[in-house]
């Protein structure tokens, strides 16, 4: 889990973030704003900590986890800094998808978002100092009863244009 999720609750910070988010209203209007940040690098110690955590939860798996940890360390040593950045950023989207599914299950509205300045978010949230970089956003809450968009039908590509069977 090479990422961290920041919940931004400070209204002044959210105003600053909105200004560098193409003025998307959800940044300030949603009751909760989550910024999914990827780690810019992963250390051997962090991998060891993760393996210890997994071993403490899944007793009897320690030997397999040591091998898996070594595999991860060796794989990551082969990555350039840019490859590491891209890989960890992709991991945030897996967490984002889980959060969106959880919101749907709980019947809570949410809006996964991009369209913001990563550099400015990192500056405003001081995330770079923690070895993090903003990757994606999730605005969460209940829509306003006057929200005109709630009555619009969702537009999606036809299934036959979206999926292709490869045989």
Language model region names:
Residues 1-167:
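Acidic, surface-exposed loops and disordered segments
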